[in-house]
Structures are given as structure tokens and as C-alpha cells.
Amino acid sequence: RADLDHEDTLSAAFEGAHGAYCMTNFFEHFSASRETEQAENLARAAKTAGVSHAIWSTSQDSRNWVSPQGNRLPESPDGYQVPHWDGKARGNRSFSELGVPTTYLLPATYWENLFMPGAPHQVQRGPDGVLAITLPAGEAKMPGMGAEDIGRCAYGLFKAGQEFVGTTVGVAAESSTGAELAAAVSEALGESVRYNAVPLDVVRAAPFPGADAVANMFQIIAEANDAYCGHYDLALSRSLNPQLRTLAEWAAANQHKLQVSMGAADRARDQPV
């Protein structure tokens, strides 16, 4: 059984493979430095096994962003502004320095977060009975896609052979504002969904792990929106994955999951404290 913390198990898993899709999960342990170490393990294992094409699921790097006021954002205890981005971004170096033939895949936000329990923008019913998506994004656009379509784009990259090796490929189905997300979910559910655009300070004060990091992420998305969206190539994404679903198509296909998630959120909210 492969373990991201143990290089030898990864080497055994990669043995004889032509390609390897490599990804880590920050939210399993909430440690950016551990995620970077796991990336190094994946890169070393791919090198040892002689993988011909690795796809490394990376992320943007908050170190490349400077606020319009020149201010630093609040940092996590280990010095990261957006740890769930930065640990992956710093992992890029392992693949390049080891000479692993790698495509650096930059996937957009998963729309599945809309029905993921505990996600900041899970669709939930408010005290007034109205469904809402709550985000500190103002009118900023956010590249997004369904998780399954990320896999299909990766398959397209493997099929392309060496064409994208050594390049960073940002994939997304479309870029949507919070209001557009709410409208698509509303259409799928046949019920009004409101977009609550909240200030960043509300998120920073929220009682969930990594609240500062989530607020930092949305601050970057909002303040550098054109540059942020520019990392994602919608036309290339569709050429890699001709079945790529639009937001409306994804919402319609996931109507039941959205309904189940909302029901669970309602029950949790109604539990006595």
C-alpha cells in the first residue's frame, strides 16, 4: 500500500508505470511543510521508477503576490500565507531538480465544495429559510470545474505525450462570480439561492481551522483577479477534455448531492447545543 510519507512504498507503486498522477491533501494534516515533503517523496519515487510522464497537481504560490498597499498577509505559524497553496507550489522544485518529466497541473476550485460539509461556501439554508452561498469574494470571478473533469483533463495531458512536459497547465471550465454560482445552483434546485458577499474579516474571525489562510486566499483572488484568472486556460481545458461540463451542466448533474448536503446542514444547525 502506497503512503505519501514513505518514498519506498511510492516507488513500488510506480514500478512499471508509464505515467503517474501525483497529488497530496493538505487538509488531511494541515501542514504545508509536510505536503512539500510528500511532493519530494513523489518526485523521488517517480525518478526511481523511471516514470516517463508525471503530472503533479500543484497550486498557485502566494509568494508571487504583493498587496496593492505592499502589505504582507497574516501568516500561519510556519510562515505561509496560504498554506494549502504554498506547500504544493514549493513541491514543484523537487520534480524539476530531479529531472522528472513533469506537467505541472493547476486545477481550478472544485465546484464540489458547494456541497462539501464544512466547506466555507457550502450551500446552506439561513435562519430566514433562504438558501445561500456565502463567500468573501465580492464581485471577483473564480475559475472552477467539477472534480471528475480534472481527471479527464489529466487524461488528455497523458494522451498528448511529451507536448506539455515542463509546462504549467491551468485547467478550468469557466470563471464565475459568487452571484453566478448562486444562480446556477438556484436553477438546478428550482429554489432561490442568495449570494452573501461577506467581508474578509468575517472569515478571519470564523471558528474553523485555517480561517486566516482561507481569507488570505480570497483576498488574493479579489485583489489580483485578472492575474489569478489568467493562470487558467479555458480553451485548452476544453481541448484536453471535450466533455468538460459548464457550471450549469455540473449543477444539474449534482442536484441530488446538493439536496442531500443541504439536508445534513439543516439537521446539524437544528441540533441543540
Predicted regions and their residues:
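NAD(P)-dinucleotide binding in Rossmann-like oxidoreductases
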Residues: 196-198
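A hydrophobic C-terminal alpha-helical subdomain
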Residues: 164, 200-273
